[in-house]
């Protein structure tokens, strides 16, 4: 079973991308609070594979992740491009008129700016992760709180989906890189032998 370190919790877009990339394989996710911890997981255990967002069609290049990658000594073994579709979700027994606050990752909030502008009554609060925002609302039964996250996260944490596809730009894609310890690269690449070779340059 492959161990995959991701930023975020179960139901996050990193979770979705990891399961799509390793479809048909058994994987165990290591959920990390931040991207630094993804690389720390690889340093602690060379068998761990990392998956991290590197570029978004709306937000652009994630410069911090490029720098972490450059410093890490890991090698890129693959990539996955995921269509990002955000949902507006709340507790199962609540509706639009009950909501006063919306929580999500800053980039997700930015990608849904037009939707949020249509609902000025909602206080916008940044969180560490899209799926984690939904998880906290459900676990702590936070009345009046909504989250912006994936539909998969809503289903995982038992949240009600009030509206799907709330992102401003429907051509919203994130490119994820799959990285590994250099000593594991050859073996891992054999499992994806049909992948197209690419080069990434950080200036």
Regions found by a protein language model. Name each.
Residues 1-203:
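Domain-level signature for soluble enzymes in the chorismate/prephenate branch of the shikimate pathway
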């Amino acid at each position: 079973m492959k161990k995959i370190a991701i930023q975020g919790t179960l139901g996050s877009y990193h979770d979705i991308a990891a399961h799509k990339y390793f479809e048909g394989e058994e994987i165990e996710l290591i959920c990390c609070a931040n991207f630094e911890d993804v690389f720390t997981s690889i340093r602690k255990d060379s068998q761990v594979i990392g998956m991290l967002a590197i570029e978004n069609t709306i937000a652009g290049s994630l410069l911090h992740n490029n720098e972490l990658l450059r410093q890490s000594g890991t090698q890129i073994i693959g990539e996955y491009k995921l269509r990002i579709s955000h949902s507006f979700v709340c507790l199962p027994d609540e509706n639009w008129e009950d909501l006063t606050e919306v929580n999500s990752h800053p980039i997700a909030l930015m990608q849904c700016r037009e939707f949020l502008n249509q609902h000025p009554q909602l206080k916008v609060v940044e969180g560490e992760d899209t799926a984690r925002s939904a998880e906290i609302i459900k676990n702590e039964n936070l009345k009046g709180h909504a989250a912006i996250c994936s539909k998969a996260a809503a289903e995982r944490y038992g949240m009600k989906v009030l509206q799907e596809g709330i992102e401003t730009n429907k051509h919203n894609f994130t490119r994820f890189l799959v990285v590994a310890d250099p000593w594991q690269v050859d073996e891992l690449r054999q499992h994806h032998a049909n992948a197209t070779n690419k080069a990434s340059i950080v200036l």
